[in-house]
Amino acid sequence: MEETSPRRRREDEKSVHSTEPKTTSLQKEVGLLSGICIIVGTIIGSGIFISPKSVLANTESVGPCLIIWAACGVLATLGALCFAELGTMITKSGGEYPYLMEAFGPIPAYLFSWTSLIVMKPSSFAIICLSFSEYVCAAFYLGCRPPAVVVKLLAAAAILLITTVNALSVRLGSYVQNVFTAAKLVIVAIIIISGLVLLAQGNVKNFQNSFEGSQTSVGSISLAFYNGLWAYDGWNQLNYITEELRNPYRNLPMAIVIGIPLVTVCYILMNIAYFTVMTPTELLQSQAVAVTFGDRVLYPASWVVPLFVAFSTIGAANGTCFTAGRLIYVAGREGHMLKVLSYISVKRLTPAPALVFYGIIAIIYIIPGDINSLVNYFSFAAWLFYGMTILGLVVMRFTRKDLERPIKVPIFIPIIVILVSVFLILAPIISSPAWEYLYCVLFILSGLIFYFLFVHYKFRWAQKISRPITKHLQMLMEVVPPEKDPE
């Protein structure tokens, strides 16, 4: 079947409320509020509610712990400002992928998409949904651990539901994100206000001598920063959907400037609230810090905490799915994945094949269950690609002076972020060397085999296999190649 023009087949444009003529491509459905909600909703998952102790464990006192949380927020903001320059200079979806392509060529871009799409993003999606499932199941299995099969089935159902919602409508996906972000901000506000009230009542014992017993070694401080910045991961999510942002030149930087400082303030104030009712030792021993806080402060309404933590995790999962599907779509459009993964639903105008592919890979990761170590070992790879991308920003200042830059950050900002990236790449390897890091590097480099076989040389036998797959999936899912918007 030839890839016929979709203009004759577009019959259901009523699902997209606009008087402008539509092409079968991703539509600009995401405004400033939705952009802020994507950033906030994706960064704030379950970690700050369940286990904000990773930073404290490495600093061993309250004062340095709060300073690290604030410093990590500043660094995340600096990194996001660099991505704002990139996103307004190269207005393509896909996050780091188009920037690496423009700065260094197809091979680094392919290795990024290979690593992200096969390991990092679907495994993170699976972990978030498993966390959601465990919190929901806990309400029905009081006093005992829920069966693993039940947890996995509920997590798989959550993945299917989120994938379906985002495949049905961009607008519906963004509305769901807005609702769950509002829900998590409600519980954040409850914890912060309760903490401030307790602080005003004189619960300041844990803030006295707050630097006593602090760890000052380079190794401990580096691990504290590493864990803190991991909690801020997601600051670049809006760059994955640049093509769907209304007025990206304005809304992308504004969403960053509003969203990340908001998260930073929330993280600092929530930690302060926790320390008003828990000593550092008690916080480190708590299995779920927000639940412990709720039991001590909000009783008999403490049940709202696990409920809203579940809302928070499902919101983070929705934001992750919403943005990651665009990376698959862009990689397919560039010929770095199956071409059908870049196709658009005729009726829904969503990257449905990319989202379905992403959901299937995430469900596969649920089967073994314990994939936290996989994500931990691959997290240094995330900073490898962050650093390469921002290095590309510096390189393009000299090699692509012709590109228009609506936003241009001072050169010291990307240099700082590059140095931090190098530090975060080397810190876990030096402090806790393990063979797994070598395996991660080998996996990343193994993408070169697939690149040269299927992308660079494009062997005929591979095309003979992919063509019937594309043909049947196109008919089954009612999808077509994306068109360019009319100028």
Swiss-Prot record:
The keyword Lipid metabolism does not apply. Pfam families: AA_permease_2. It catalyses: L-leucine(out) + L-arginine(in) = L-leucine(in) + L-arginine(out); L-histidine(out) + L-arginine(in) = L-histidine(in) + L-arginine(out); L-arginine(in) + L-phenylalanine(out) = L-arginine(out) + L-phenylalanine(in); L-cysteine(out) + L-arginine(in) = L-cysteine(in) + L-arginine(out). Keywords: Amino-acid transport, Cell membrane, Disulfide bond, Membrane, Phosphoprotein, Transmembrane, Transmembrane helix, Transport. The chain crosses the membrane at residues 32-55, 63-84, 111-137, 148-169, 170-193, 218-238, 252-274, 303-325, 352-370, 371-391, 411-431, 435-450. L-arginine binds at residues 43-47, 233. The keyword Cell membrane applies. The modification Phosphoserine is found at residue 18. GO terms for molecular function: amino acid transmembrane transporter activity; antiporter activity; broad specificity neutral L-amino acid:basic L-amino acid antiporter activity; L-cystine transmembrane transporter activity; neutral L-amino acid transmembrane transporter activity; peptide antigen binding; protein heterodimerization activity. One of its GO terms (biological process) is L-cystine transport. Residues 56-62, 138-147, 194-217, 275-302, 432-434 are extracellular. It is found in: Apical cell membrane. Residues 1-31, 85-110, 239-251, 326-351, 392-410, 451-487 are cytoplasmic. Outer medulla of kidney (at protein level). Kidney and small intestine. In the kidney localized to the apical membrane of the proximal tubules. Its main location: membrane. Residues 1-20 have a biased composition (Basic and acidic residues). Residues 1-23 are annotated as: Disordered. It is a multi-pass membrane protein. PANTHER family: AMINO ACID TRANSPORTER (PTHR11785), B(0,+)-TYPE AMINO ACID TRANSPORTER 1 (PTHR11785:SF354). Disulfide-linked heterodimer composed of the catalytic light chain subunit SLC7A9 and the heavy chain subunit SLC3A1. The heterodimer is the minimal functional unit. Assembles in heterotetramers (dimers of heterodimers) and higher order oligomers; the oligomerization is mediated by SLC3A1 likely to prevent degradation and facilitate heteromer trafficking to the plasma membrane. Interacts with CAV1. Belongs to the amino acid-polyamine-organocation (APC) superfamily. Associates with SLC3A1 to form a functional transporter complex that mediates the electrogenic exchange between cationic amino acids and neutral amino acids, with a stoichiometry of 1:1. Has system b(0,+)-like activity with high affinity for extracellular cationic amino acids and L-cystine and lower affinity for intracellular neutral amino acids. Substrate exchange is driven by high concentration of intracellular neutral amino acids and the intracellular reduction of L-cystine to L-cysteine. This is b(0,+)-type amino acid transporter 1. The lineage of its organism: Eukaryota, Metazoa, Chordata, Craniata, Vertebrata.
